[in-house]
Regions:
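An N-terminal, well-structured beta->alpha segment
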Residues: 2-3, 8-106, 135
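N-terminal small/polar loop signature for handling phosphorylated ligands or for N-terminal nucleophile
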Residues: 90-138
Length: 138
């Protein structure tokens, strides 16, 4: 288990957070239960993907956790070699809150790792993403 207080302080001091995110974390200062619930450990990837409350924190759903999780996927793809990186990934978004921001963050991480990204420009149903995966040969 992480030292949640240390992790909270690390996030609070991070340049990666914008002013609103820092304010959100500053607002919970002194609320040990809330700090622990947000920082006791990383959000886990389950059978339905990443699921959590949209808040700032390591155990919450936010753009920083999306980037962190995507880096893990990027590492796996990169370990498979240049062919896997060239095949790349397909990313789409749905109508849920922050879906577009999360899709863009994931695309940025993949691209920064030299992985080809095909991202849909607008909302798409899951079967269309499944089709893209098959169509592009993944």
């Amino acid at each position: 288990m992480l030292d949640y207080k240390r992790e909270y302080e690390r996030w609070l001091a991070s340049d990666a957070l914008n002013a609103d995110e820092k304010a959100e974390l500053q607002a919970i200062a002194g609320d040990e239960k809330e700090i622990e619930s947000r920082f006791y450990g990383p959000l886990e990837f389950g059978t339905a993907g990443l699921r959590g409350t949209m808040k700032v924190g390591l155990h919450q759903m936010n753009v920083h956790v999306i980037r962190w999780a995507t880096q893990g996927f990027a590492d796996v793809i990169a370990a498979e070699g240049d062919e896997a990186k060239q095949k790349g990934v397909a990313i789409c978004m749905d109508c849920r809150v922050n879906s577009m921001a999360f899709a863009r963050a994931a695309a940025e991480v993949c691209a920064a790792n030299g992985i080809r990204v095909r991202i849909f420009e607008s909302l798409r149903p899951t079967p269309e993403l499944s089709f893209a995966v098959r169509y592009y040969g993944w």
